[in-house]
From Swiss-Prot:
GO molecular function, one term: structural constituent of ribosome
The protein's role, per its UniProt record: This protein binds to the 23S rRNA, and is important in its secondary structure. It is located near the subunit interface in the base of the L7/L12 stalk, and near the tRNA binding site of the peptidyltransferase center.
Family to which the UniProt record says this protein belongs: Belongs to the universal ribosomal protein uL6 family.
Highest taxon of the lineage: Bacteria
Cellular component terms (Gene Ontology): cytosolic large ribosomal subunit
Name of the protein: Large ribosomal subunit protein uL6
Subunit structure: Part of the 50S ribosomal subunit.
Gene (name only): rplF
Pfam entry (one): Ribosomal_L6
A biological process from GO: cytoplasmic translation
Alphabetized UniProt keyword annotations: Ribonucleoprotein, Ribosomal protein, RNA-binding, rRNA-binding
């Protein structure tokens, strides 16, 4: 058995989990989400916990077993605690501003960049407008959103200008030494 997949997932208080065919629905205090599962694995809810089982020991089934259990665990954690990802904006005149469901960036281009946030994702900017925090219930959507924001102006290795993850370390390069 998969070491991760065979562990049952305890359902926290104030959380409802329902399985409808291959669709798992999770509702909690922070919000609700649903995601499809592969038909090769079965998800069952009983006695306050979620159990994931697989029909055989093929390599594909083993992989899907652990994956499905982790997706269920992430969904439960998301509706209880939520997820967040920090981004930092480095560069002279580079800043961000949240306006409703949009983030307006000044990233050194000749025009402002407007990024529309997907459903279920919120953003906050600090007072200096250089630290951005995106929050959401769905870990997958949150990661994709953070990656798309970073891709607007990836950090460059010479001066470190651009948008980077808060915990990311940029390997810096030396510039040209000049003609001798």
């Amino acid at each position: 058995m998969s070491r991760i997949g065979k562990l049952p997932v305890k359902i926290p208080e104030k959380v409802k989990v329902s399985v409808d065919g291959n669709l798992v629905k999770v509702e909690g205090p922070k919000g609700k989400m649903s995601f499809p599962t592969n038909p090769r694995v079965k998800v069952a809810v009983d006695k306050g916990e979620v159990q994931v089982t697989r029909p055989d020991d093929s390599p594909e089934s083993k992989g899907l077993h652990g994956l499905t259990r982790t997706l269920v665990k992430n969904a439960l954690d998301g509706v209880v605690k939520g997820y967040e990802r920090g981004l930092e904006i480095n560069g002279v005149g580079f800043k961000a501003e949240v306006k409703g469901k949009e983030i307006h960036f000044a990233l050194g281009f000749s025009h402002p960049v407007v990024f529309k946030l997907p459903e279920g994702v919120t953003a906050e900017v600090d007072a200096k407008q250089t630290k951005l925090t995106v929050k959401g219930v769905d870990k997958h959507v949150l990661g994709l959103t953070a990656a798309k924001i970073r891709a607007l102006r990836p950090p460059e290795p010479y001066k470190g200008k651009g948008i980077k993850y808060a915990e990311e370390i940029i390997r810096r390069k030396e510039g040209k030494t000049g003609a001798a």
